[in-house]
Amino acid sequence: MKVDDPENKVNNKFRYDKLSKASLIVSILLSIILISTIILRERGLQKTEELRKIYYEGTDLTELSKKSEVQKSEPHKIQKSFEELLKINPETVGWIKAGNLADEPVVYRDNEHYLKYDFYGHRNSIGTVFIDAHNSDWKHSKYLILYGHYLKNGGKFGSLKRYKNIEDLKNNLTITWNTIYEDEPEEYVVFSVFESSMLKSEKDYFYLRRFEELKTGEKEIEKLIEELKKRSIYNIPVEVSPNDKIMCLVTCSYGTRDGRLLVFSRKIRPNEVVDTLKDKIIKKTEFTNEK
């Protein structure tokens, strides 16, 4: 009959207690990190509300529209609404408002920094909405790409997921892009919404910078526009031509590997009325459910 060694029992108990304490410490540290992340996110979203107050208190879009007619031949001047924002962050380039789904300041730098830093320059996982680094001439570019994090509470570009709902699309069909300069804000109308992968190995892969690299003529651009409309989950009766200015809003989506939700819009033409389009929009297919 085997007799347990009392010393082994003591050693085993000591090792067990040591492992238990280590597990407890790790659990506590992970909890602290999680709580800290949540607190930082909430503070970041509160700060965004402060930025909106600064921006809208200094903005008179009616007066700005009148000024733009006079100032078209003058050098660009900074709008009053952006003066305070530029003091906080000199890399500010504009403000994006996608109906009631996104209302954010926009910055320009590289494609990495603002994934992890807020508008105030603090490290924060909510990031900041930014223009693609390849849009260096963002003021005159005919194709703009704007990135924003997907937050489950709807912050940043998180609420763009509501474009999956046809009623939300109809209610948020237009997007306003206002640069820091004293020009009239540009109005855009959505013409394509779809999910894609950033991985070349996936069948739903889409290369975002294709517009920039199409310099061979209008036919190639027309084919790309046709592809965007074909990929869209909606039939949206918006005519798009190679001469139109196009904007793409990008956020993460979890229905495919390394997925992105892409919302394409084009600049509204002079005297164009888009409200009448709402009743003509048809949904073609369903999105993959979010995880």
PLM regions: where:
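Hydrophobic H-region at the start of alpha-helical membrane spans
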Residues: 20-31
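N-terminal Lys/Arg-rich, disordered targeting/topogenic segments
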Residues: 1-18
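Solvent-exposed, non-transmembrane regions of membrane-associated and secreted proteins
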Residues: 31-291
